[in-house]
Amino acid sequence: MKAYWYDNKPGDQREPHDSGRPVTVDYLASIGVQYYHFPSLESVNELAKERGYKNRDEIVVSPQAMGDVYEEKVKMFFNEHLHEDEEIRYIRDGEGYFDVRGQEDEWVRIKLAKDDLIILPAGIYHRFTTDDKNYVKAMRLFQEEPKWTPLNRGPDVDENSHRQSYLRTIQNKTVA
C-alpha cells in the first residue's frame, strides 16, 4: 500500500497522479479508512468473523473479464460516490487505486496491491480505478446480502444521514 495526496493534474485516471506528498496510515485512520496487509486468507477470515462479514464474492476488473463494458465500468467506478455500508476490498491479484476525500475535501490516492485489504467507512466519498495494467482481482466482503449501491455526490447526497454521521465521526480527529 502506498498513500499520497492526489496531484489533480489532467490525464488518465489510471496513471499514478502522485504529488510526491505521502499520506500516513494514521491520517487514513483519522478519516475512518482502515488498512491491513494479509498475506493469508486465514487472516481475512478472522477479520470477517470479528466484524460480522457474512458474505463475500470476487470481482475481476479487466478488459478480458468484462469485455466491451470494461471502459464503461471503470468510468462508473471512478465517479465520486459514497455507500451507506462499509466498503471492504481484499486485493487477490493486480493493483488498483482508491481515492478518498480527506478532511479538507482533497483527494488522497491509495494504491493497493496483492494481499492489501481496505475498509472504507459508510458515508466517505471515494472512487476507484485500476492502474495502467488494467487488471485487479478483488474479494468484496459484506455484512449482509451483497449490494453495491453507489450514491453519486450531489447536494442531496451531502445531506444523507450516513454522510452526516461520517462527518460527525471524523470532525474532531486531526493528524498531520
UniProtKB/Swiss-Prot annotation:
Can you list the GO cellular component terms from the UniProt entry?
A: cytoplasm; nucleus
Listed A to Z, the keywords are: Amino-acid biosynthesis, Cytoplasm, Dioxygenase, Iron, Metal-binding, Methionine biosynthesis, Nickel, Nucleus, Oxidoreductase
- Kindly state which reaction or reactions the protein catalyses: 1,2-dihydroxy-5-(methylsulfanyl)pent-1-en-3-one + O2 = 4-methylsulfanyl-2-oxobutanoate + formate + 2 H(+); 1,2-dihydroxy-5-(methylsulfanyl)pent-1-en-3-one + O2 = 3-(methylsulfanyl)propanoate + CO + formate + 2 H(+)
Which Pfam families does the record cross-reference, listed alphabetically?
A: ARD
- Chief place where the protein resides: cytoplasm
Cofactor binding, note field = Binds either 1 Fe or Ni cation per monomer. Iron-binding promotes an acireductone dioxygenase reaction producing 2-keto-4-methylthiobutyrate, while nickel-binding promotes an acireductone dioxygenase reaction producing 3-(methylsulfanyl)propanoate.
Which residues participate in Fe(2+) binding?
A: H81, H83, E87, H126
Supply the Gene3D superfamilies for this chain.
Jelly Rolls (2.60.120.10)
- BP-aspect Gene Ontology terms: L-methionine salvage from methylthioadenosine; methionine metabolic process
Q: In which pathway does it act?
A: Amino-acid biosynthesis; L-methionine biosynthesis via salvage pathway; L-methionine from S-methyl-5-thio-alpha-D-ribose 1-phosphate: step 5/6
Q: Where in the cell is it found?
A: Cytoplasm; Nucleus
For this protein, the Enzyme Commission number is 1.13.11.54, 1.13.11.53
Enumerate the residue ranges of region (Disordered).
1-21
Q: Which residues bind Ni(2+)?
A: H81, H83, E87, H126
GO MF terms held by the record: acireductone dioxygenase (Ni2+-requiring) activity; acireductone dioxygenase [iron(II)-requiring] activity; iron ion binding; nickel cation binding
Enzyme class, one word? oxidoreductase
- Record-linked InterPro entries: ARD, ARD_euk, RmlC-like_jellyroll, RmlC_Cupin_sf
Q: Where is the composition biased (Basic and acidic residues)?
A: 9-20
**Requisite cofactors:** Fe(2+); Ni(2+)
Q: What does this protein do?
A: Catalyzes 2 different reactions between oxygen and the acireductone 1,2-dihydroxy-3-keto-5-methylthiopentene (DHK-MTPene) depending upon the metal bound in the active site. Fe-containing acireductone dioxygenase (Fe-ARD) produces formate and 2-keto-4-methylthiobutyrate (KMTB), the alpha-ketoacid precursor of methionine in the methionine recycle pathway. Ni-containing acireductone dioxygenase (Ni-ARD) produces methylthiopropionate, carbon monoxide and formate, and does not lie on the methionine recycle pathway.
Q: Which family does it belong to?
A: Belongs to the acireductone dioxygenase (ARD) family.
> What name appears for this protein in its UniProt entry?
Acireductone dioxygenase
Species: Aspergillus fumigatus (strain ATCC MYA-4609 / CBS 101355 / FGSC A1100 / Af293) (Neosartorya fumigata)
Q: What is the lineage of its organism?
A: Eukaryota, Fungi, Dikarya, Ascomycota, Pezizomycotina
